[in-house]
A protein has these predicted regions:
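Juxtamembrane/disordered regions of integral membrane proteins
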Residues: 1-157
């Protein structure tokens, strides 16, 4: 139970400190929207992607044409909550880094966001002191960051 309380608190601290730092230096950029969206939705989206991977594994490894796909459907709320609880701190870090760079909605920005997602995922794995977890969290963080960047970053003027 301890990490589920600690990670959202760390995410809140990262988001608030990052916003206060950036609001003074770049008031024209929507820092709050980018940081808040990444903090609140990044981990949950990662949990949703994990559920999708589990569903693909069930479908691919099913020996019969009648697939019992109720497992991923039952696991979806738990996965989103776990992803939101554990992944909110790396997602907040990614959101602060993207807001600091003042990125706009473009494919290059999505690639940069994916790179920051990889870095944040590796940091999350290192926090767990588990290198295989880093290898699992990195691509999930990259894909989650790229998807959110395509939706949240401001459009070019």
């Amino acid at each position: 139970m301890f990490p589920f309380i600690l990670f959202p608190l760390i995410a809140g601290v990262i988001a608030i400190v990052g916003y206060r730092y950036l609001a003074k230096r770049q008031p024209e950029y929507p820092n709050g929207r980018v940081i808040a969206t990444f903090t609140l939705l990044g981990g949950g989206l990662g949990g949703l992607l994990v559920t999708f991977l589990i569903y693909l594994t069930v479908v691919i490894n099913s020996p019969s044409p009648l697939i019992d796909d109720s497992l991923p459907q039952r696991f979806l709320p738990v996965s989103v909550l776990l992803g939101g609880g554990i992944g909110c701190a790396p997602a907040a870090l990614c959101g602060v880094l993207l807001a600091k760079e003042q990125l706009i909605r473009a494919w290059k920005s999505s690639l940069i966001a994916a790179w920051y997602g990889v870095i944040s995922g590796v940091v999350a794995g290192i926090i767990f002191l588990n290198i295989p977890a880093s290898l699992f969290f990195a691509p999930i963080g990259a894909l989650s960051a790229a998807i959110l960047a395509a939706m949240v970053l401001p459009k070019a003027e």
